[in-house]
């Protein structure tokens, strides 16, 4: 049966990657279909009810700067907001929000159902329609054939998903949802490298059975940070605290005594789990010297009693989970509402993707999210936006676009995945970026919104607010350069009280703000110096640009040097055995990875600077020197 309409972009899967992919394509004015096995689970938070964190918050801000929905949904559903690393430099400060799980899902669904150019259809995807070596649509579980110029796969943990609780296991995409078996089998028939990964989740607990009074309360920040560049704290619902408790030696003894009943340690689970979000079994084994591990007790929402004990993800049998939970301070009488579990699933080697998220081997087919070996809502959302954007560009026969490593954490992640691949669930950290000072949360809009506008991702409302902010920043910087404090200034005494070294010569406000001990707010509070900008985001931007100007300039110089050969193209059909002077090891690695550019090649383990020089000589000699735009 043929579906009555053809689409420019078909997105398979309605999680965090799929919703961003579908809305990105729709914002570009393209006829877009979001295909999901269950409309009621659109935007569902399968794991912890939180958005952001170090590295992750940066990705959310970048998604928002390009018009994405995650930050706005979080502002409407966030029940606790904090800035992490607030005492450190601006490069590593990160926003994190606790979200009401049900409210977040409802907000996302409402956004999707009212999105221009976007249709939603409830059917599982079982097959792809092929036209030679290109995809031309999808086939649903009930045999409906839907034609599309491009297809984006954002299927999360559903491909051959296998859920483990102790020695028992059953097929599932996540708890309560069926797996995708037919599509997984179809993809295994294609020329794609495939492997298995694992992730897990803790048991959920009824708050009425917990003694929160013996735990440490953790409140949100005041004033509250806002996630979206066009958001406001007034949008936030009622705010609530989280709580902190710890495991203890009794907890650890229970786990050690039951490791033989763990599917991970009994060899039942083959997939590799996330290094930076390990199960409690892993923690006890890997950090045997630790007598306690922190547990963040997170409310699931404002209308439920369920708690999410972040830090005790487990796949041990249910009876052991009860013992573990009840050994923890405050949980002595805890009632578990849902058992914890581990899930194994198929993922595809992201080295088989171009930097625009398109398969190197199957034209018009794009991948985003956990199918690429990543973990986390934020990583999925960022990939989804890039895949949806580039699927939209492909549908219009336009050139692809992706950010470089110096432009966005998105660029860092995509380059890491497509160049180096991953053997374990990939998670974003600020430490993965070489140019952290350029890739701050606060300047994500400065870096990306103008580009997003050109690509058709940024609407008039966001563009207007962005330009107002930019004008405020520029005018304030001009004012600070042209406002001078001289030794006879009536406010000299107040200025000298602010600085470590009193003024002996005339200085403008910009010079004063460069001093480490001076803040923008304190300087503006001096009579005759202000008024301060009323927009706190614009004021922060002024302060950071002035205080860190020298460091920022140095990073731009480093970027300029690095870019000289970064974008030199390497033909995808190039046989590196034909390049004289390369070692067998280098030839094997380059033929395996098939890098798109010299920059990608240079980041492959074992590819030496000498090998890069040989490649450049070969390209020049054969008239193959080309650069990306």
UniProtKB/Swiss-Prot annotation:
Keywords: Cytoplasm, FAD, Flavoprotein, NAD, tRNA processing. Signal peptide: none annotated. This is tRNA uridine 5-carboxymethylaminomethyl modification enzyme MnmG. Homodimer. Heterotetramer of two MnmE and two MnmG subunits. The keyword Ubl conjugation does not apply. The lineage of its organism: Bacteria, Pseudomonadati, Pseudomonadota, Gammaproteobacteria, Aeromonadales. PROSITE patterns: GIDA_1, GIDA_2. It is found in: Cytoplasm. It holds the Pfam family GIDA.
């Amino acid at each position: 049966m043929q579906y009555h309409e053809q689409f420019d972009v078909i997105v398979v899967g309605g999680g965090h990657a799929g919703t961003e992919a579908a809305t990105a394509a729709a914002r570009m004015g393209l006829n877009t279909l979001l295909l999901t096995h269950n409309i009621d689970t659109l935007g569902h938070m399968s794991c912890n009810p939180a958005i952001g964190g170090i590295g992750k918050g940066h990705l959310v801000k970048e998604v928002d700067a390009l018009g994405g929905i995650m930050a706005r949904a979080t502002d409407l559903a966030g029940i606790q907001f904090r800035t992490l690393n607030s005492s450190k430099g601006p490069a590593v400060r990160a926003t994190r929000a606790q979200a009401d799980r049900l409210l977040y899902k409802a907000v996302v669904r409402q956004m999707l159902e009212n999105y221009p150019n976007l249709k939603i259809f409830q059917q599982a995807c079982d097959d792809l329609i092929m036209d030679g070596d290109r995809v031309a649509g999808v086939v649903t579980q009930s045999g409906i054939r839907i034609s599309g110029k491009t297809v984006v796969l954002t299927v999360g943990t559903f491909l051959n998903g296998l859920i483990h609780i102790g020695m028992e296991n059953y097929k599932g995409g996540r708890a309560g949802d069926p797996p995708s078996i037919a599509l997984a089998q179809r993809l295994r028939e294609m020329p794609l490298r495939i492997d298995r990964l694992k992730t897990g989740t803790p048991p959920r607990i009824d708050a009425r059975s917990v003694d929160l009074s013996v735990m440490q309360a953790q409140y949100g920040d005041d004033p509250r940070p806002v996630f979206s560049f066009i958001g406001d704290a007034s949008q936030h619902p009622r705010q609530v605290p989280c709580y902190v408790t710890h495991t203890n030696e009794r907890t650890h003894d229970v786990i050690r005594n039951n490791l033989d009943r763990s599917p991970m340690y009994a060899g039942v689970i083959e997939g590799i789990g996330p290094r930076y979000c390990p199960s409690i079994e892993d923690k006890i084994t890997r950090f045997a010297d630790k007598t306690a591990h922190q547990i963040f007790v997170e409310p699931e929402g404002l209308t439920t009693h369920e708690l999410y004990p972040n830090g005790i993800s487990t796949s041990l049998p249910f009876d052991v989970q009860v013992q573990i939970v009840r050994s923890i301070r405050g949980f002595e009488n805890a009632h578990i509402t849902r058992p914890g579990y581990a899930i194994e699933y198929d993922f595809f080697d992201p080295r088989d993707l171009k930097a625009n998220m398109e398969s190197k081997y199957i034209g018009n087919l794009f991948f985003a999210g956990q199918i690429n070996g990543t973990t986390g809502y934020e990583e999925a959302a960022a990939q989804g936006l890039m895949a949806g954007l580039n699927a939209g560009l492909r549908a219009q026969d336009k050139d692809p676009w992706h950010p470089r490593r110096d432009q966005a954490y998105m660029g860092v992640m995509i380059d890491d995945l497509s160049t180096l691949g991953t053997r374990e669930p990939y998670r974003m950290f600020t430490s993965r970026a070489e140019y952290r000072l350029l890739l701050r949360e606060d300047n994500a809009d400065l870096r990306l919104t103008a580009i997003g506008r050109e690509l058709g991702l940024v609407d008039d409302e966001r563009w207007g607010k962005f330009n107002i902010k930019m004008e405020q920043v520029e005018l304030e910087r001009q004012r600070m350069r042209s406002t001078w404090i001289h030794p006879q200034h009536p406010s000299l005494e107040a200025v000298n009280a602010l600085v470590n070294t009193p003024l002996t010569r005339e200085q403008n406000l910009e010079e004063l703000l460069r001093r480490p001990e001076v803040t923008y707010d304190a300087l503006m509070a001096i009579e005759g110096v202000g008024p301060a900008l009323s927009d706190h985001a614009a004021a922060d931007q002024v302060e950071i640009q002035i205080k860190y100007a020298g460091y920022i300039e140095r990073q731009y110089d480093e970027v300029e040097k690095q870019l000289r050969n970064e974008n030199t193209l390497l033909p995808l059909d190039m046989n590196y055995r034909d390049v004289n002077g390369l070692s067998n090891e280098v030839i094997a690695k380059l033929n395996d990875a098939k890098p798109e550019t010299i920059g990608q090649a240079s980041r492959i383990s074992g590819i030496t600077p000498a090998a890069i020089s040989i490649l450049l000589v070969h390209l020049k000699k054969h008239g193959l020197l080309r650069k990306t735009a």
